[in-house]
């Protein structure tokens, strides 16, 4: 499924060797995916239980995932333009 694909991407990314300048890009990308996975775990708990706290945790984690991804993209663009 989708989560398994994300986990495979993380495993591949963690094995990937990149230039020192690009390590923060890769690390932010990994952090983004890890937060996305955790978000889905909490969202599933919310769907099953109706617990609004789980929904809030899910949304917060998804927001963190977006922020990490945005940082990765911005760092990459800076490196490519620099």
Language model: regions and residue ranges:
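C-terminal amphipathic alpha-helix
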Residues: 1-2, 38-82
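Short, solvent-exposed, charged loop/turn and helix-capping segments
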Residues: 3-30, 78-82
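Extended, hydrophobic/aromatic-rich amphipathic alpha-helical segments that build helical scaffolds
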Residues: 30-40
């Amino acid at each position: 499924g989708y989560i398994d694909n994300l986990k495979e991407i993380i495993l591949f990314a963690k094995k990937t060797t990149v230039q020192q300048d690009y390590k923060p890009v890769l690390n932010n990308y990994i952090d983004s995916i890890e937060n996305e996975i955790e978000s889905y775990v909490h969202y599933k708990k919310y769907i099953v239980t109706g617990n609004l706290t789980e929904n809030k945790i899910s949304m917060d984690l998804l927001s963190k995932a977006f922020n990490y991804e945005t940082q990765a993209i911005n760092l990459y663009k800076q490196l490519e333009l620099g």
